[in-house]
Amino acid sequence: MKKLLIGCLILLTSACQSTTPTPTPSLFPTSTPPPTPIPATASPEPSSTPEPSPTPFPRLFTEEFDGSLAGWVILQAGNDGVPNIKTEGSRLILQMDFPYIWLYALYGPEDYANIRIDAQFENRALTPSSAGLLCRYSEESGWFEYNVSADGTYNVLYGRWLSVGVAEYLPITDGTSRKIQPSGATQKIGLTCSDSTLWLYVNETLIRQVDVSSYELTEGKVGLAASSFENTPIVIGFDSITISEP
């Protein structure tokens, strides 16, 4: 209907034009100008909830092996037989079913110069075997290793890798101590690496100080050690390890 009225109005206006044309009123009321269109923008996608940052690994701590071994690295020398490594009953269990295996559990996130390491463990083997501690471990330069055996002996070694899975051990010192308990007993060992001296502890008693000034190891990682000899199986359970200032 609106189209028809507009057509009639145009015809009448053309036929009756005067010299000064009268402005034609608008057929539609004056409307408010349409708003300036806003450029289309992509709808924002829903943002995902940020995941919490992982807890940084501590530098000084006590590990009681209640959970995973995150931050720890397992290395093996000697026999390439696969060991059984697990956490069970708040213990790190290192089981070696093959002879002449040296196992290491290294704490990877940190390097230390002067540091003290203490561990509590149980040697369940009825045959010769050892448990120990490491300090100043470097894949390129080597490490210091302190071991105690169920027969009452101990030693300190300088170890270094010759190739993958093949290590060389140079004896620094050895001895015996009545403080070392037989197999089946829970006991503690401690090692302080301070400048050019190693301090050896058994059941919280200092048994020896060792001069290592001739070895150019200034800092590195720390860790635990376990080894089997000619008879197997060997099972060593670490209850805890404490890393502290010397």
Task: Describe the residue ranges of each PLM region.
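Ser/Thr-rich, Proline-interspersed low-complexity disordered segments
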Residues: 16-62
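Secretory/extracellular carbohydrate-interaction modules
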Residues: 96-163
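Short carbohydrate-recognition loop motifs
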Residues: 82-101, 225
